[in-house]
Amino acid sequence: MATRHQARMAVVSLLYAFDLGNGNIAEHTDEILEEKKIRNKQKDFALTLYEGVMANITPVDEAIVKHLKDWDFERLGAIERATLRLATYEILFGELDSAVVINEAVEITKAFGTEQSPKFINGVLDAISKDK
């Protein structure tokens, strides 16, 4: 059985694919989640997160851009952008404590991002959580 952490990692993968230009990724979410063994409640959780990010992508991206220090949104790595989008959505619209969301994002970034990514992600998300 998949965990919420694994479900979030799958959502980051979906957002990553979307960001790389796969605009029809939404048509394949069920297949992708099944392939990653994200099922039942965790599948519902993952779909809720993915659909929530996509439905709120403009305010999510605006919050990220507002808190980037000396960075251009388009220059962010696709993994970092996907992770920031998911975590920002959860901070702004979710029910979890921001510290938990930030920790999850940092852990996901450790798995997918560069060596410097976790610190960067932590800083941006901390600023977003303080400003919400």
UniProtKB/Swiss-Prot annotation:
* Disulfide topology: none
Q: Which UniProt keywords apply?
A: RNA-binding, Transcription, Transcription antitermination, Transcription regulation
Gene that codes for this? nusB
Q: What is this protein called?
A: Transcription antitermination protein NusB
List this protein's GO terms for biological process: DNA-templated transcription termination; transcription antitermination
UniProt GO cellular component terms: cytosol
- Leader peptide range in chain numbering: none
| UniProt GO molecular function | RNA binding
Q: PANTHER family, from UniProt? A: ANTITERMINATION NUSB DOMAIN-CONTAINING PROTEIN, N UTILIZATION SUBSTANCE PROTEIN B-RELATED
For this protein, the record's Pfam families field holds: NusB (PF01029)
Gene3D superfamilies per UniProt:
NusB-like
State the organism of origin. Answer: Sulfurimonas denitrificans (strain ATCC 33889 / DSM 1251) (Thiomicrospira denitrificans (strain ATCC 33889 / DSM 1251))
